[in-house]
């Protein structure tokens, strides 16, 4: 009886190990936009964003859109001491001189 259990275990264990192998990637996923370092990310419906947008005469899209405030581009990761101490985001929308960048999604990377 014990030998059957061990035999089945030795047959099934490699199958389970092979089934759970998932390739791991540590690189950020921002293939359709640009990496930005922003002081904060807010909804377009936020009152502060509304004031800034009104003063600059910018028309944003939907109110559930995320926008980055005071952003600077991150061009090359890990070269030249590039670091972001605020929020690293991937932005796919318009960039208004870095003051407001539309369509930003926060991503977690260690820069």
UniProtKB/Swiss-Prot annotation:
Task: Please state the span of the N-terminal signal peptide per the UniProt entry.
Answer: 1-21
Q: What's the domain of life for this entry?
A: Eukaryota
* Keywords for the protein's UniProt record, in alphabetical order: Cell wall, Disulfide bond, Secreted, Signal
Q: Which InterPro entries match?
A: Hydrophobin (IPR001338)
* Applications: Acts as a good biosurfactant, stabilizing emulsions in several conditions (concentration, pH, and salinity) and decreasing surface tension to a comparable value to that of some synthetic surfactants. Hybrid protein-metal nanoparticles can be synthesized via a simple one step method using vmh2 and gold. Vmh2 strongly binds to Au core whereas surfactants act as outer shells. Even if engaged within the hybrid complex, vmh2 can interact with a model protein, BSA, more than a standard organic-metal nanoparticles can do.
Assembly, in brief, is:
Self-assembles to form functional amyloid fibrils called rodlets. Self-assembly into fibrillar rodlets occurs spontaneously at hydrophobic:hydrophilic interfaces and the rodlets further associate laterally to form amphipathic monolayers.
What's this protein's family per the entry? Answer: Belongs to the fungal hydrophobin family.
What protein am I looking at? Class I hydrophobin 2
Gene source species: Pleurotus ostreatus (strain PC15) (Oyster mushroom)
Lineage summary: Eukaryota, Fungi, Dikarya, Basidiomycota, Agaricomycotina
